[in-house]
Amino acid sequence: MRILLLIVAIQLSILSIRAQEEPEYRLELGAGAGTVAYYGDFNGNLFKGMQPWGALVARYHLNPRMAIALNIGTGKIKGSTDNIDTWYPIERYEFSHQLTEADARYEYNFWAYGTGQEYRGARRVVPFIAIGFGLTHHSGEHSGVTVNLPIGAGVKWKVASRVNLIAEWAMRFTPSDYLDGKSDVYGIKSSGLFKNTDCYSAFQLAVSYDLWAKCKTCNNDIY
């Protein structure tokens, strides 16, 4: 009986060692593409008027369940007074403005993310949520820079040991009412940080590559 238990213990030890043969990587770099849509006075539908979107992405892994992500993206937003139900006390108006943003986010994976060969119990496909802070530059007559607060969710897929495919959707809330070039079109003043302000959302599909292998003897992760 003791011999059998010893054999089982040895086998479990071997499996544990094999499960951690691949290194963990700290950094991801990649690029993505998708669509961006404006939501404000001249568009009340998040899925209407979508325009092309491109981005560069970087991600620093704190541990298999948490990461800090950097996103630099750009795209156009469009809108007009045509084909909307609300009446506006201005003449026909339309706009096409360029947005360029940079933001940092905290990401939380619902399960440990990986191939399962570098961290026991890690999964190749995991959902995640994200929240962050950034800056957005918008073109137009009232061009300028405003704060954006991205809140989103997505799915990560470990396609290969060092290749990742990430699909995400995030809403960017801003305190500005000039992304569309017009403010207070009804002339009614309102209070509140995000009340009657413009915002935009982006759906993004990105591919990234893992870099910077973690020291195998280091055990200073924060879990």
Where are these regions (language model features)?
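Predominantly the C-terminal beta-signal and adjacent terminal strand-loop region
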Residues: 81, 99, 160-223
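Short glycine/proline- and aromatic-enriched beta-strand/turn motifs that initiate or cap beta-hairpins
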Residues: 19-59, 204, 208-214, 223
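Residue-level detector of the transmembrane beta-barrel scaffold of outer-membrane proteins
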Residues: 28-30, 67-69, 128-130, 164-166, ...
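Residues on the lipid-exposed face of transmembrane beta-strands in outer-membrane beta-barrel proteins
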Residues: 31-35, 56-60, 104-108, 131-135, ...
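Outer-membrane beta-barrel translocator domains and adjoining extracellular loop/strand segments
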Residues: 42-46, 81-87, 117-120, 141-145, ...
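Outer-membrane beta-barrel channels and translocator barrels
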Residues: 24, 61-65, 111-113, 158-160, ...
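Gram-negative (and chloroplast) outer-membrane scaffold detector with strong preference
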Residues: 66-141, 209
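Residues that define the transmembrane beta-barrel architecture of outer-membrane proteins
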Residues: 25, 48-52, 98-102, 125, ...
